[in-house]
């Protein structure tokens, strides 16, 4: 992952996290399409904007009914061919062990808004792309399918279990443990005994 001015690039995608400055005239970086950082209809600022090299984009916005007690997010997906999908999702009710990409983005937005786990956006992005040699890309159909992102986060924990990566390892571990907790509370996986 390359990090520059709070703008992150993974080989197939770009995104910005909370409290980052999104360049006003961002058209491409590393041959990436522009992020949808402002909703073209409501003019709301995105919590998590993502752009893929194929021209598709996903962005998460706080819904009109959003409050800290009611963390509803509008997640929008535009594919490179102009197809569009939008869902309203309660970020606190997402089971990351059985979630679509759109649900995972709502979960990441929920984590970001509550300030825990630390660096939630980057952690969620790692769970999305995985630790495989070839990062995972999601077509619109795949973005709507259910995936086990908790297990992918566990892979990130395992691969960084080395003193050289301890800071990242601890961040991934905090996210993994929170994912296990949310999964258990939302009817999914039960917390593993360590």
Language-model-detected regions and their locations in the chain:
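Type III/flagellar secretion export determinants
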Residues: 1-194
């Amino acid at each position: 992952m390359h990090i520059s001015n709070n703008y992150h690039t993974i080989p197939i995608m770009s995104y910005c996290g909370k409290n980052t400055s999104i360049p006003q005239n961002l058209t491409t970086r590393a041959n990436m399409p522009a992020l949808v950082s402002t909703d073209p209809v409501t003019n709301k600022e995105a919590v998590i904007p993502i752009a893929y090299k194929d021209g598709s984009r996903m962005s998460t916005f706080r819904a009109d009914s959003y409050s800290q007690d009611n963390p509803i997010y509008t997640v929008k997906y535009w594919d490179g061919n102009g197809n569009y999908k939008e869902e309203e999702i309660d970020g606190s009710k997402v089971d990351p062990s059985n979630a679509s990409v759109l649900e995972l983005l709502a979960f990441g937005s929920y984590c970001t808004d509550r300030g825990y786990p630390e660096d939630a956006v980057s952690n969620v992005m790692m769970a999305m792309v995985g630790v495989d040699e070839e990062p995972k890309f999601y077509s619109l159909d795949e973005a709507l399918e259910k995936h086990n992102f908790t297990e992918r986060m566990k892979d990130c924990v395992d691969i960084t279990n080395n003193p050289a990566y301890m800071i990242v390892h601890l961040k991934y571990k905090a996210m993994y443990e929170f994912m296990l907790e949310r999964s258990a509370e939302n009817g999914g996986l039960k917390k593993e005994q360590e």
